[in-house]
Amino acid sequence: MAEGVFQGAIGIDLGTTYSCVATYESSVEIIANEQGNRVTPSFVAFTPQERLIGDAAKNQAALNPRNTVFDAKRLIGRRFDDESVQKDMKTWPFKVIDVDGNPVIEVQYLEETKTFSPQEISAMVLTKMKEIAEAKIGKKVEKAVITVPAYFNDAQRQATKDAGAISGLNVLRIINEPTAAAIAYGLGAGKSEKERHVLIFDLGGGTFDVSLLHIAGGVYTVKSTSGNTHLGGQDFDTNLLEHFKAEFKKKTGLDISDDARALRRLRTAAERAKRTLSSVTQTTVEVDSLFDGEDFESSLTRARFEDLNAALFKSTLEPVEQVLKDAKISKSQIDEVVLVGGSTRIPKVQKLLSDFFDGKQLEKSINPDEAVAYGAAVQGAILTGQSTSDETKDLLLLDVAPLSLGVGMQGDIFGIVVPRNTTVPTIKRRTFTTVSDNQTTVQFPVYQGERVNCKENTLLGEFDLKNIPMMPAGEPVLEAIFEVDANGILKVTAVEKSTGKSSNITISNAVGRLSSEEIEKMVNQAEEFKAADEAFAKKHEARQRLESYVASIEQTVTDPVLSSKLKRGSKSKIEAALSDALAALQIEDPSADELRKAEVGLKRVVTKAMSSR
């Protein structure tokens, strides 16, 4: 890689199933990986020798299911006892354990048991995306804009930001996926000038968002947002997988539920069938020797696929209704409905949405897999002063807080301070008081959600305001100040008005939140793993070079015509050097240096023997 640092910031769409990276240098470019693919699987695999990320990891998943990790986005920022985590664990082949209430992934790597947080796995995928960009740009990349589902809560946003830090990136901004896609749509279609209401329907591999935006004169204002952080293509695959499992059991009497390899192979076949059914109405699914020597063969119609997922498909309309209601806009006022995310290719999803909007033509002008990274790259260029076009220089993004933020009051009642769909950044205040006489400490539990009962919302963290002057109950004036930044991340301060005493948190003791020491430790570990990957690659290369050189010299020595060109008496020296080289290849775990030395030694002897007689 050439020296120098890229002055801009790359845009990364960190997806549940696939990730995508884009850069902006006078225009947006989606960058293909070394396989030539413009999206890279969000997979990390661990083997006794090395770590694989992306296509290489996904391609060996069936052979190494227990140590191939995916879906980290479904774990990030969640508690171990989260209902969705517990449900997902039943379908994942890798092991998730509870460490202090947080989910941690356990794998075998370099013949040891290792544990990784979801942030660390996500950081590995981010590092891969960063390297893909660096290979194209030819410079070191330090800054990025990373996207998250609009419906991600504070803990999930902060954990994603932490993943960026672990990967060595300076995350300039966390932006919402549908908002990023809206930029791609507005710029790509040259439609950012004309005033319009646009609904972004973003159904990906693992998450679902709907955002309603008002676009006018380069100003993108999010009016409302809704979604489900646990709905996407993976769930449609799971329903197909269950259907095929039952069919296989009915035909053969065999249950593959506990066989990770068979499940992975059948899931891959289910995913392939799902994709095929977007363009044809019937497909055949075949998996040779799926389990116990029995083959699996089945035919699947599009109608059956739609039937198996009918409830999930129908549920995608609920957030659409919600955003219209929240923005107080009727469906007839929506100018465009824009499809984003690979799962919007499913014909039934498109039909339900079009029917909801009374037969409206859906907008498919942007690439559903690439739009989010495209928008993130534009935002990265704006934040680093690299955007040069007239279209982007006046572009302004006004996003919203997806869920209400507030504090727990007496009786576990949720006191909202920042209502959902408030434009961010924002500062909101609310006053509280004491509930008993001479109370000197008040605890502020901070929640995010929409339920009246605090227990049904997400606890983000808590802190105490101490040394309140002794007064009768209800007299002290305590002000809670909520600041939400442009990343959607919250800082809370509480002030006792008569003394000015204050206490604040950036929700530091929250769910899955890493301390700066933990992040630093993970950054160092990430560097070590990268160094180990590089050392393994060098060793592999050195071994291949030596093996191929040894093979060519063996051919020379045994070929009567070629060996006749050797100096007299040198054949035995070459044979001795060959046996040294072969011995180096037999060593249990030779270093790249040892293999290189063996190659140089053999070359020296051969060169002398070949020089003019």
UniProtKB/Swiss-Prot annotation:
The modification N-acetylalanine is found at A2. Its EC number is 3.6.4.10. Residues 392-402 are annotated as: Inter-domain linker. GO terms for molecular function: ATP binding; ATP hydrolysis activity; ATP-dependent protein folding chaperone; heat shock protein binding; protein folding chaperone; unfolded protein binding. Keywords: Acetylation, ATP-binding, Chaperone, Cytoplasm, Hydrolase, Nucleotide-binding, Phosphoprotein, Protein biosynthesis. Coiled coil: none annotated. It is found in: Cytoplasm. Induction: Expression decreases after heat shock or during growth to stationary phase. Up-regulated upon carbon upshift and down-regulated upon amino acid limitation in an HSF1-dependent manner. Interacts with SSE1. Interacts with FES1. The modification Phosphothreonine is found at T47, T431. Residues 601-613 are annotated as: Required for interaction with ribosomes. Residues 403-613 are annotated as: Substrate binding domain (SBD). Its main location: cytoplasm. A motif (Nuclear export signal) lies at residues 574-582. It catalyses: ATP + H2O = ADP + phosphate + H(+). GO terms for biological process: 'de novo' cotranslational protein folding; cellular response to glucose starvation; chaperone cofactor-dependent protein refolding; cytoplasmic translation; protein refolding; regulation of translational fidelity; ribosomal subunit export from nucleus; rRNA processing. Residues 2-391 are annotated as: Nucleotide binding domain (NBD). Residues 516-612 are annotated as: Lid domain (SBDalpha). ATP binds at residues 16-18, 73, 205-207, 271-278, 342. It comes from the Eukaryota. One of its GO terms (cellular component) is cytosol. Ribosome-bound, Hsp70-type chaperone that assists in the cotranslational folding of newly synthesized proteins in the cytosol. Stimulates folding by interacting with nascent chains, binding to short, largely hydrophobic sequences exposed by unfolded proteins, thereby stabilizing longer, more slowly translated, and aggregation-prone nascent polypeptides and domains that cannot fold stably until fully synthesized. The Hsp70-protein substrate interaction depends on ATP-binding and on allosteric regulation between the NBD and the SBD. Present with 104000 molecules/cell in log phase SD medium. Binds to ribosomes. Binds close to the ribosomal tunnel exit via contacts with both ribosomal proteins RPL35, RPL39 and RPL19, and rRNA. Directly interacts with nascent polypeptides. This interaction is dependent on the ribosome-associated complex (RAC). Interacts with SSE1. Belongs to the heat shock protein 70 family. Ssb-type Hsp70 subfamily. This is Ribosome-associated molecular chaperone SSB2. It comes from Saccharomyces cerevisiae (strain ATCC 204508 / S288c) (Baker's yeast). The gene is SSB2.
